[in-house]
Amino acid sequence: MNINEIAKLAGVSRATVSRYLNQGYVSEEKKKIIRKVIEETGYQPSSQAQMLRTKKTKLVGVILPKIDSNTISREVAGISDILTKQGYQLILANTNNSTEEELKYLSLFRDNQVDGVIFIATILTKQHKDMLKEYRVPIVLLGQHLEGYPCIYQDDYKAAMSLTEELVKSGKKFGYITVTDKDEAVGRKRLSGVEEVLKKNRIELNSNCVKCGSFTLESGYEKTEELFNEYPDIDTLICATDTMAVGAVNWLKKNGYQIPMQVQVAGMGDSYLGKIVEPNLTTVHFFYKTSGKEAARMLIELMESENVPIHKEIKMGCKVVMRGSHRSI
């Protein structure tokens, strides 16, 4: 079955079928006829031929830091929902938080035939920024804010402030488990939000009460052990991610601490782990799936329109979710 046979069965010209296949103008009446013939015959247009005609591959590269992350899976689900409906196929590139792998895949997608790239970023180095300056493929950053580039990012500072404002109502001695400050969003912004609220409430956050973890359950467990061995009187523990907070809860329970009576614990991210740990984890909900959808929509605009401003940015909202791991007043 070829395009000429489809045209003959539909009673239209070959050019009309070609326009239909390439999203050109075709009257609604003829669209219905052509669609019906294609469905009945099971015709599949040659992707190679379409690519030669349109110079489009309908492929999008998605660079992600960690394939087993609940946050990333929600973002990718949102990306996929939008792009697959528009006929795009995704190529997922898992970097395991390696800068070298990220740069490798950015180069690979730039030099090979993808129509666009979504880069789920954690740490943006000088090398990343230098490459992005010369990037000739439409690209959207997801998860980090970079001035002058299309990006979707969370309001991490506000999220941390809003959460801490709830916890200071019943907490006096605070500990915090962060991640590397090379991560602008999760590392710096969230810690800054916590510190700002504590300062306003005249609560000291001793620098020794801030421990640096690495996004994992194990690091949450280990850093909580370090923290409470040094400061056993901490009554409020905030973690930069839910995963680390669940690790913290595990250590506290194992060592006889009553949650939330002795120690209230909170994370950020509203992951499934926080909903199954006992007590359920107080957290901040980020709209990760929605942010994935917004990134996909923005990329489609960049790929399909010549009039999209390159500085388009979207800062996502968030909401505090109070559960059983915090003390009620």
Question: PLM features: what roles do these ranges have?
Answer:
Residues R14-T16, L52-D68, E166, K173-D181:
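Short beta-strand segments enriched in small/hydrophobic residues
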Residues M1-K58:
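N-terminal helix-turn-helix DNA-binding module of bacterial transcription factors
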Residues E40-S46, E100, I120-T122, Y221, ...:
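Short gly/ser/thr-rich secondary-structure transition/capping motifs
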Residues T84-D130:
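Central regulatory/effector-binding core of bacterial HTH transcription factors
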